[in-house]
């Protein structure tokens, strides 16, 4: 045919190829080639002039080849262009000439189809109206249906391009479209399908101009809705669904919206009436239509013997119209009455075959029931597509509806032999398609297979349709014993076996059957199940996953070995592909408690690559790539460097601190007794453990780059060096894991006053611009109830009180922890290091425990679910969903609702936090007042004790002076030098070899924070004693850790800070030196007096120091019990 196209016009001068016989080899450009092709087609269609030789291809012979010629011409690309205008002009003239003749009208339409699609814009605008008139003339003739079909196809393209040009759009709308619709309505019955195609094109591209004929069009469509031809019925339904958009609408399409809703309610009312007529008496509790719709006036044929068939066909057409109205696009936002549509669907699907009588026309009604259910399921799918995830409030109804339909159509499915199609497979396929669509739209929120009776029923049906049929061999008993028991009685002679022809059965290998039987329902069930597992897998129960593993893995191996094939649905490549897809879904979305079958899946996919079907083998290759990415990732995963001790349970990732997020709850582990506390080894703990007296610190701490959660800080955030935990500011509390002490050293004892009675110390805020001795500013604005102890350098720490029982559990703070660095050790300006030592982040908040002071933190309610009850209800009607609205309107509405909900939640959270803080601060103020009263009483007692001790010392000194000066005064004056004054940092002289002096730290300040209320919790007998001590600097701690066995350096004298207030230690020392200058006379008296005076001096110094510190920070000292001997602090 191509040779005929190129050689048919060799005689014409315009069609000749320049360059002689070079042919296409002489053509250098594509446009030139298309021009030659156009001229060749023109030469084929028109006779040669000026020649007596007859044409090689007469026009009547070239007409059958013309559609093929047009298609071949389109293969070469667009024929439009400035260089082809002359050839296109020749084709336009030729097309108009052919359209005017009845015999050549089909050829003219073929040329016109090429010109409409390939002509440039200028040529199209010039000839569009004339072409439209020519087509209208063709529609008014009595041409054959093939010519009418081609004319309507050209009309559709003509209207599509004309709607893009405003001038042509206005001209055709006002002057030509009503006449065109009238011509289409007047076509004869055998051309009804072409007429519907033309009307659909007019309503699609020119909806406003069709408004004048809306009534006539509606009647025409309704008369064809119940047509017996499926194509004609589908076209009529599509045209009827476009009726609400016809005509001119007001602003924002209000009139169109009202028309759409009116048509929808009319369809619902008519469908309810038809369903009642079809199954009158078969419904247990029929739902009456209460909508505003008016029933349609459908044509009725009197004397029709098949009334039920006509009603069924009409029901099918109106249900399709309703589904198309829901699923097709509409120009204005509309409201869908979801509850009314679901009521109709449930009413239709509740008609069961068990309730239909088998007398009269009952069998015919039963015969029609599966098709009625199919239409209802199609309508449900259209509703899901139209409303999407906004149907979640009806999710329970939908999840119950699907297994109900499967139960009603599972009768007699197990009694058939393999190779036969099971009954009602089409209905079950439609149910599984709806399941897949519902899960695809709503995801894990669909709630499918997540427990309940409906989920178990659905899973049972899915597994039954997926499992291949098994060949059942029925063993028949001997003829003499119907029950199969052996015959007893007198033995008889053996008889010869006779061949029973009636019992001769064909072997199972030679059986008539369909190899693709049940493949559709099996593929649909596999597809729906794999989609459900992929979207809802982690939420499905572990038992369901195990059941699927037990079914799928042997089935895959049987398919690969050829054992399952034969008469099973897995002979179809589509079912095998969906089976592999289900296996991949089980691998990608496993249950948290059931490991995925990774090794078996890898083997199965590897063997699946050898499948004969390219579709199956290519899917297995893709699945292997996915599995390889899971098992061997190209980038190593981020594994946090946690502590060396194993964690007993997986810990969720830490969340950023937020004032609206409650701290994670960790249940407190059991508190072991002090005696049974392990001294070494890992001790996993689920939460902070309250301390009971001095707990030996056996902590194997995380590295210096780990935070308090055991995660690597460098992998999370870049923390400045000052905030990194270091040994000089990180104290192991009772809520931390134990570590081993340095080599050979006993575990140091942490007094409970350092842990503040077992509580986690609250951070104190220290603000400084430069680390200098004179620039320390202490700010306690956020923790006004805390107390701070500043201990001068060199002062020995007060010994801890003996442990007396377990302390009460720690109380959770009412608010979120505030991140603030602790106070670093104060250093001299000349020894200030270039990089300050790292500091630890604030400790995590302890878990909330039940107690009188514990306040529940505010919880953040997720958006869209107030109170966690369910999805938000609509303001006006819960059963109406707006669809087809613009994205901007929906986003503005959703943003407005979300902002209002967030503001309400934030106000509630802030109100709760303010109430909690007010209650907390009121309690703290009461405790402070009680402490002030106790402090005043203790201060008075301290002053009285000091006066009594001063009087006793003066009396003792007077007695000593009288004794000394009375007996040997001159010897004393001429004797040796006076005894040296004991410095305050030295231990008592009673046992100098037992007590080792502490290493002298650099000058610094120690901040210890104690929450008031600890004394009330401990009671009067176990009140915590403040143990002030000086923190060592970083360098000294490193030296101590590096050489723990090394001896302590010699103590240095305490230097007075220029910015610190003058202490009373030096004055007391000087007074003590003046008073104890004379040496004793006798050794016994001397020793007794020295011991007495040393003890009194030490007690007084400690009491004075405590009083001075209490005056400085208004913190009452605890002097109710005499302090035990000083112990060395590690």
Swiss-Prot record:
Biased composition range(s): Low complexity: 672-684
Phosphoserine: residues carrying this PTM: 13, 477, 481, 1033, 1043
Motif range (LXXLL motif 2): 69-73
Residues bearing PTM Phosphothreonine: 488, 745
Span(s) of short sequence motif LXXLL motif 4: 155-159
UniProt motif (LXXLL motif 7) ranges: 271-275
Described function: Coactivator of estrogen receptor-mediated transcription and a corepressor of other nuclear hormone receptors and sequence-specific transcription factors. Plays a role in estrogen receptor (ER) genomic activity when present in the nuclear compartment by activating the ER target genes in a hormonal stimulation dependent manner. Can facilitate ER non-genomic signaling via SRC and PI3K interaction in the cytosol. Plays a role in E2-mediated cell cycle progression by interacting with RB1. May have important functional implications in ER/growth factor cross-talk.
UniProt protein name: Proline-, glutamic acid- and leucine-rich protein 1
Biological source species: Macaca mulatta
Originating gene: PELP1
């Amino acid at each position: 045919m191509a040779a005929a196209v190129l050689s048919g016009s060799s005689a014409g001068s315009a069609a000749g190829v320049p360059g002689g016989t070079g042919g296409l080899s002489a053509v250098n450009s594509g446009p030139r080639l298309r021009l030659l092709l156009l001229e060749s087609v023109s030469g084929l269609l028109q006779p040669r002039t000026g020649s007596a030789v007859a044409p090689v291809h007469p026009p009547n012979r070239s007409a059958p080849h013309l559609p093929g010629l047009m298609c071949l011409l389109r293969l070469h690309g667009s024929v439009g262009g400035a260089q082809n205008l002359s050839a296109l002009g020749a084709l336009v003239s030729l097309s108009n000439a052919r359209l005017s003749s009845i015999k050549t009208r089909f050829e003219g339409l073929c040329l016109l189809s090429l010109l409409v699609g390939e002509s440039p814009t200028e040529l199209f605008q010039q000839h569009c109206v004339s072409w439209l008139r020519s087509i209208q003339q063709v529609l008014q003739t009595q041409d054959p249906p093939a010519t009418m079909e081609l004319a309507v196809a050209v009309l559709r393209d003509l209207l599509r391009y004309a709607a893009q040009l405003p001038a042509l759009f206005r001209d055709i709308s006002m002057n030509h479209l009503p006449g065109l619709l009238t011509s289409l309505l007047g076509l004869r019955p055998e051309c009804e399908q072409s007429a519907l195609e033309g009307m659909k094109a007019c309503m699609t591209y020119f909806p406003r101009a069709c408004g004048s004929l809306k009534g006539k069009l509606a009647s025409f469509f309704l008369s064809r809705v119940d047509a017996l031809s499926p194509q004609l019925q589908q076209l009529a339904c599509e045209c009827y669904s476009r009726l609400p958009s016809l005509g001119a609408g007001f602003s924002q399409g209000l009139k169109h919206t009202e028309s759409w809703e009116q048509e929808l309610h009319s369809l619902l009312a008519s469908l309810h009436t038809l369903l009642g007529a079809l199954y009158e008496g078969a419904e247990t509790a029929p739902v009456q239509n209460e909508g505003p719709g008016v029933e349609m006036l459908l044509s009725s044929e009197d004397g029709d013997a098949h009334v039920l068939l006509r009603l069924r066909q009409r029901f099918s057409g109106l249900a399709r119209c309703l589904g198309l109205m829901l699923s097709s696009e509409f120009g204005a936002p509309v409201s869908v009455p979801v509850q009314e549509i679901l009521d109709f669907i449930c009413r239709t699907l509740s008609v069961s075959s068990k309730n239909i009588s088998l007398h009269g026309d009952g069998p015919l009604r039963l015969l029609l029931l599966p098709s009625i259910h199919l239409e209802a399921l199609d309508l449900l799918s259209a509703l899901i597509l139209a409303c999407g995830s906004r149907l979640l409030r009806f999710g329970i109804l939908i999840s119950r509806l699907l297994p109900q339909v499967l139960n009603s159509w599972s009768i007699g499915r197990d009694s058939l032999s393999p190779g036969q199609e099971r009954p009602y497979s089409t209905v079950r396929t439609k149910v599984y398609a709806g399941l897949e669509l519902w899960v695809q739209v709503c995801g894990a929120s669909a709630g499918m297979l997540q427990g309940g009776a409906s989920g178990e029923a659905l899973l049972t049906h899915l597994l039954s349709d997926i499992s291949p049929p098994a060949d059942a061999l029925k063993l028949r008993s001997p003829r003499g014993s119907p029950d199969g028991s052996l015959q007893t009685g007198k033995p008889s002679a053996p008889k010869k076996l006779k061949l029973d022809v009636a019992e001769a059965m064909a072997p199972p290998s030679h059986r008539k059957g369909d190899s693709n039987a049940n493949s559709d329902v099996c593929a649909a069930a596999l597809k729906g199940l794999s989609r459900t597992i992929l979207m809802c897998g982690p939420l499905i129960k572990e038992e369901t996953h195990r059941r699927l593993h037990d079914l799928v893995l042997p089935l895959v191996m049987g398919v690969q070995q050829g054992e399952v094939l034969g008469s099973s649905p897995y002979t179809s490549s589509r079912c095998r592909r969906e089976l592999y897809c289900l296996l991949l879904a089980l691998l990608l979305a496993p249950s948290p408690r059931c490991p995925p079958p990774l090794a078996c899946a890898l083997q199965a996919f590897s063997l699946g690559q050898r499948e004969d079907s390219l579709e199956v083998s290519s899917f297995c290759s893709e699945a292997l790539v996915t599995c390889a990415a899971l098992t061997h990732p190209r980038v190593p995963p981020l594994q946090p460097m946690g502590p060396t001790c194993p964690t007993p349970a997986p810990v969720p990732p830490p969340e950023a601190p937020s004032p609206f997020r409650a701290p994670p709850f960790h249940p407190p582990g059991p508190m072991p007794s002090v005696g049974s506390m392990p001294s070494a080894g890992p001790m996993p703990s689920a939460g902070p453990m309250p301390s009971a007296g001095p707990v030996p610190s056996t902590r194997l701490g995380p590295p210096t780059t780990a935070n308090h959660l055991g995660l690597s800080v460098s992998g999370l955030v870049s923390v400045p060096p000052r905030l990194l935990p270091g040994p000089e500011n990180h104290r192991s509390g009772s809520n931390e894991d134990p570590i081993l002490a340095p080599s050979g050293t006993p575990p140091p004892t942490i007094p409970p006053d350092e842990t503040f009675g077992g509580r986690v110390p609250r951070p104190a805020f220290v603000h400084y611009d430069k680390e200098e001795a004179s620039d320390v500013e202490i700010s306690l604005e956020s923790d006004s109830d805390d107390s701070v102890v500043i201990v001068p350098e060199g002062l020995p720490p007060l010994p801890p009180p003996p442990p007396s029982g377990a302390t009460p559990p720690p109380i959770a703070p009412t608010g979120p922890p505030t991140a603030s660095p602790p106070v670093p050790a104060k250093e001299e300006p000349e020894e200030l290091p270039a990089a300050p030592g790292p500091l630890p982040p604030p400790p995590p908040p302890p878990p909330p425990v039940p107690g009188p002071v514990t306040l529940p933190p505010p919880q953040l309610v997720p958006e869209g679910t107030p109170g966690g009850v369910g999805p938000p209800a609509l303001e006006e009607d819960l059963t109406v969903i707006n669809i087809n609205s613009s994205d901007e309107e929906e986003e503005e509405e959703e943003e407005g609702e979300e902002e209002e909900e967030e503001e309400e939640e934030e106000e509630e959270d802030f109100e709760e936090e303010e109430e909690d803080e007010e209650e907390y601060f009121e309690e703290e103020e009461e405790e402070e007042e009680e402490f002030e009263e106790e402090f005043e009483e203790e201060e008075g007692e301290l002053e009285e004790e000091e006066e009594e001790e001063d009087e006793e010392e003066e009396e003792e000194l007077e007695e000593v002076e009288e004794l000394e000066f009375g007996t040997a005064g001159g010897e004393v004056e001429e004797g040796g030098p006076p005894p040296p004054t004991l410095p305050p940092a030295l231990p008592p002289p009673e046992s100098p070899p037992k007590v080792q002096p502490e290493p002298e730290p650099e000058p610094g300040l120690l901040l210890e924070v104690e929450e008031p209320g600890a004394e009330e919790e401990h009671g009067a007998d176990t009140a915590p004693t403040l143990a002030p001590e000086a923190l060592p600097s970083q360098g000294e701690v490193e030296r101590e850790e590096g050489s723990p066995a090394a001896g302590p350096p010699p103590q240095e004298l305490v230097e007075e800070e220029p910015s610190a207030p003058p202490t009373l230690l030096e004055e007391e020392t000087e007074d003590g030196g003046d008073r104890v200058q004379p040496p004793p006379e006798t050794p016994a008296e001397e020793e007794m007096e020295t011991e007495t005076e040393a003890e009194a001096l030490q007690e007084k110094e400690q009491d004075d120091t405590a009083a001075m510190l209490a005056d400085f920070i208004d913190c009452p000292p605890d002097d109710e019990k005499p302090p035990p001997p000083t112990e060395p602090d590690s």
